[in-house]
Amino acid sequence: MEDFNASLGPAVCRICMCGETSIPYLGQQAGEPLISPCKCSGTMGLFHRSCLEHWLTLTSTTNCEICKFAFKIKQKSRNFIDYIRQGGYKKLQSNRNPFIDFAFVLLILPFAFFGVFMSVEGALYAGRKYHYAFENRDNDENGNLEVRNQTSLECALFLFVALLLFSAFITLVVSALWHHFRQYKIWQAKNKIMFVVDQLDAEQSMHFNPQWKKQGGGWKEKIAKFWGEIRRRPTRAYIPEIARNDSIPIEPVVGISPVLVANFNRTSPDSNNTHHHDESRNEIPFGRRTPEQAICVSMSSTPQMYAEKLEKLTLSPIGLDDLFANSRATSTRRESGISPESSSRRDMRKTHSVYSVCSSFGTGVMSCSTPVADNNLRTLTPSPISLSTFKSGCPTEPVVAINLNDSGDTVTIDSQRGRFHVETLENDYNS
């Protein structure tokens, strides 16, 4: 039955009509993930966070114009550098240009300084004259009273002029600063930065391409990484997420190569996130402590992903891991074409695989297993709804041909190269 809720095209942002890896993100990342913060379904509900925030800032709205959903918004005020850089003083004709006022202040500053300096010097000169007349008052019958009165008046006049010039200059500067500060506050109130809070959690948000590697990092991250290397703890690995797109390939933008990275978190034996019929999934992946040690994982590649339809999909949080474990589960399938020295290998070792969590608004989880070029290949059943391709640069190595399916097809390194398997988690793990 046709699913009318499924999108027929690739996942793109509703505003810029571009995919996840089509635009640079914060100047460092390969692309920006798509989020679904409103109730619109399909690609109509997908946004780049930066595009949505820019649109809400320009339109001064907080609701979706289609579903009328009220976005959860957090606002942040812009600084004065943004005000100057974006030309906020040009929004109204009544606003004065701060650069012109600043140039005018710089122009009159030397004149004001010279006027105050000369006034103070005149007051000091009059004070010295008064002091000389006062010291020689006995030589004059009037006690140099006329000279003393004149110098006192001159000193007071010079001090008044100096104070007047200084007050006028300070008043001019303060008034200019207050005017531009008021202009800036009005612009700041009308041009706040809006941060959209995604209504869905990390699992329910739709991420359509593999997670990219985090670039750089601050000094805290570097110290934590160095301390982790000293204690020999595994570094954090980002979870690759593969989207459901109803058998429509997601073509990445030319020139951008997403990186498939494995997640190495351990699942507990009593967790509902594991297959209870397969205890080997809970084993610790000895010898595989970091993503860099995994074969054919964390290599730049160009993925073409075909996801599974919504059939028997179950909800489970991110943290599921198809661990890089060495299982010794006895295989009951027949083996053929095996050399005599390897004929005793009935306990097949599981291949290294990545557990990928995917959901469309919390509707499903899929397991993704990537074959490794070694002597123990895991067979991939050719099914149009459960088989995906992943072009990788695995080195060519000789491998023993093993037949693990009933179709009689021979599984070789060439036939299994660059493929990964998408499995649906059944509901029987709760039983």
From Swiss-Prot:
Residues 267-289, 327-349 are annotated as: Disordered. Keywords: Cell membrane, Endosome, Fertilization, Membrane, Metal-binding, Transferase, Transmembrane, Transmembrane helix, Ubl conjugation pathway, Zinc, Zinc-finger. It comes from the Eukaryota. GO terms for cellular component: endosome membrane; plasma membrane. Its EC number is 2.3.2.27. It holds the Pfam family RINGv. Zn(2+) 1 binds at residues 13, 16, 48, 51. Disruption phenotype: RNAi-mediated knockdown results in delayed degradation of the maternal plasma membrane protein cav-1. It is an enzyme of class 2 (transferase). It is found in: Cell membrane; Endosome membrane. The chain crosses the membrane at residues 98-118, 157-177. Zn(2+) 2 binds at residues 38, 40, 64, 67. Pathway: Protein modification; protein ubiquitination. One of its GO terms (molecular function) is zinc ion binding. A zinc finger (RING-CH-type) spans 5-74. One of its GO terms (biological process) is protein ubiquitination. It is a multi-pass membrane protein. It catalyses: S-ubiquitinyl-[E2 ubiquitin-conjugating enzyme]-L-cysteine + [acceptor protein]-L-lysine = [E2 ubiquitin-conjugating enzyme]-L-cysteine + N(6)-ubiquitinyl-[acceptor protein]-L-lysine. E3 ubiquitin-protein ligase which positively regulates the fast polyspermy block during fertilization, preventing entry of more than one sperm into the oocyte. After fertilization, required in the zygote for the selective degradation of a subset of maternal membrane proteins including cav-1, chs-1 and rme-2, probably by mediating their K63-linked polyubiquitination. The RING-CH-type zinc finger domain is required for E3 ligase activity. It is also required to prevent polyspermy. This is E3 ubiquitin-protein ligase marc-3. The gene is marc-3.
